[in-house]
Amino acid sequence: MEALVYTFLLVGTLGIIFFAIFFREPPKVPVKGKK
């Protein structure tokens, strides 16, 4: 079960950093068909 906790923490941290950068610097070019 430790692996599940570590994975959850890792995804959560990456998600927070991603959203922080995304909202801090809006993309200057429109992203289409890119996930």
From Swiss-Prot:
Localization terms from the record: Plastid, Chloroplast thylakoid membrane
Record's keyword annotation contains tRNA processing: no
Record's bilayer topology term: Single-pass membrane protein
Record keywords, A-Z: Chloroplast, Membrane, Photosynthesis, Photosystem II, Plastid, Thylakoid, Transmembrane, Transmembrane helix
Principal cellular location given in the protein's record: plastid
Gene: psbT
Regions that span the bilayer: 3-23
HAMAP family (alphabetical): PSII_PsbT
GO BP, one annotated term: photosynthesis
Protein name: Photosystem II reaction center protein T
Family of this protein: Belongs to the PsbT family.
InterPro entries: PSII_PsbT (IPR001743), PSII_PsbT_sf (IPR037268)
GO cellular component terms, semicolon-separated: chloroplast thylakoid membrane; photosystem II reaction center
Function of the protein: Found at the monomer-monomer interface of the photosystem II (PS II) dimer, plays a role in assembly and dimerization of PSII. PSII is a light-driven water plastoquinone oxidoreductase, using light energy to abstract electrons from H(2)O, generating a proton gradient subsequently used for ATP formation.
Quaternary structure, from the entry: PSII is composed of 1 copy each of membrane proteins PsbA, PsbB, PsbC, PsbD, PsbE, PsbF, PsbH, PsbI, PsbJ, PsbK, PsbL, PsbM, PsbT, PsbY, PsbZ, Psb30/Ycf12, at least 3 peripheral proteins of the oxygen-evolving complex and a large number of cofactors. It forms dimeric complexes.
